[in-house]
Amino acid sequence: MAHKKAGGSSRNGRDTEGRRLGVKKFGGESVVAGNIIVRQRGTKVQAGPNVGVGRDHTLFALTDGHVKFLRRAEGRVQVAVTPLAIAAE
């Protein structure tokens, strides 16, 4: 008797969850040191003053202050944190 073994159905059936990337703190918002500002793949947004970069290119605040987004030459976007002492003046 000729038998055909059942084929696998591994091509379908996946709908992966989103990675929750993007801007977490927008311009003008206050941040505490350690707060995540942007989660990204690669350096779409670059780190400015008082902003650190994680292993996965996550940008986070190094000091307490206010977030500021800046447009740089060549269409680059940079994020900085203005410290509270300066922001209060």
From Swiss-Prot:
PANTHER family registered for this protein in UniProt: LARGE RIBOSOMAL SUBUNIT PROTEIN BL27M (PTHR15893:SF0), RIBOSOMAL PROTEIN L27 (PTHR15893)
Signal peptide region: none
Q: Which UniProt keywords apply?
A: Ribonucleoprotein, Ribosomal protein
Q: Give the superkingdom in one word.
A: Bacteria
Q: Which GO terms describe its biological process?
A: translation
Can the keyword Chaperone be found in this entry's annotation?
Answer: no
The family classification in the record reads: Belongs to the bacterial ribosomal protein bL27 family.
Q: Where is this region: Disordered?
A: 1-21
Q: Provide the protein name.
A: Large ribosomal subunit protein bL27
Instruction: Please give the GO cellular component terms listed in this UniProt entry.
Output: cytosolic large ribosomal subunit
Tell me the NCBIfam families matching this sequence.
L27
Q: Name one GO molecular function term.
A: structural constituent of ribosome
